[in-house]
């Protein structure tokens, strides 16, 4: 599972997920999966989608993951009274804004890439779209 090796502070404020995304262009591969909506992806969801794509293309070509879960989400145990500090880190998420390229792929035909990204998209809680690299 993806998570930072070390952080200066263990816990983080909840914050807001506003604004526009960086990394909106396909830069490494030829095809990409771009987020249409905003939300957050957990490390498990990122890994699950990656596995679905890798299995579908039968490990040919190359896949890049363009997102990284760097925000810790805490929760308190069940049946614990309010107060007594912030809970423990349960999982890691990556905040996604519209237009962010989540995954990229190269070395496979477009039809196979579309199918693989459709499988990956089913694993994600965001609306996504298929994009190709624009050649200037």
Curated annotation (Swiss-Prot):
Q: Which domain of life is it from?
A: Bacteria
Query: Which residue stretches, if any, does this entry annotate as coiled coil?
Result: none
Question: Which molecular function GO terms apply here?
Answer: rRNA binding; structural constituent of ribosome; tRNA binding
SUPFAM superfamilies referenced in this protein's UniProt entry, alphabetically: Ribosomal protein L16p/L10e (SSF54686)
Arranged from A to Z, the UniProt key words for this protein are: Ribonucleoprotein, Ribosomal protein, RNA-binding, rRNA-binding, tRNA-binding
BP term (GO), one: translation
Q: One Pfam family name from the record?
A: Ribosomal_L16
- Protein's UniProt keywords contain rRNA-binding: yes
Gene Ontology CC: one annotated term: cytosolic large ribosomal subunit
| Record's subunit section | Part of the 50S ribosomal subunit.
Q: Return the HAMAP family for the record.
A: Ribosomal_uL16
List, alphabetically, the PANTHER family matched.
50S/60S RIBOSOMAL PROTEIN L16, LARGE RIBOSOMAL SUBUNIT PROTEIN UL16M
Q: What does the similarity note say? A: Belongs to the universal ribosomal protein uL16 family.
**Tell me, what does this protein do in biology?**
Binds 23S rRNA and is also seen to make contacts with the A and possibly P site tRNAs.
* Protein name as catalogued: Large ribosomal subunit protein uL16
Q: Which organism is it from?
A: Shewanella frigidimarina (strain NCIMB 400)
What lineage is this protein's organism placed in?
Answer: Bacteria, Pseudomonadati, Pseudomonadota, Gammaproteobacteria, Alteromonadales
The UniProt gene name for this protein comes to: rplP
């Amino acid at each position: 599972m993806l998570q930072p090796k070390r952080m200066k502070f263990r816990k983080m404020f909840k914050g807001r997920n506003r604004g526009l995304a960086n990394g909106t262009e396909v830069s490494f591969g030829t095809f990409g999966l771009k987020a249409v909506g905003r939300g957050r992806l957990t490390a498990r969801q990122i890994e699950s989608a990656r596995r679905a794509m890798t299995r579908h293309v039968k490990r040919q070509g190359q896949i890049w993951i363009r997102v990284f879960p760097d925000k810790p989400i805490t929760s308190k145990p069940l049946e614990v009274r309010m107060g007594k500090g912030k809970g423990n880190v349960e999982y890691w998420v990556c905040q996604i804004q519209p237009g962010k390229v989540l995954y990229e792929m190269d070395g496979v035909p477009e039809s196979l890439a579309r199918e693989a990204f459709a499988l990956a998209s089913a694993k994600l809680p965001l609306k996504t779209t298929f994009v190709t690299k624009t050649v200037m």
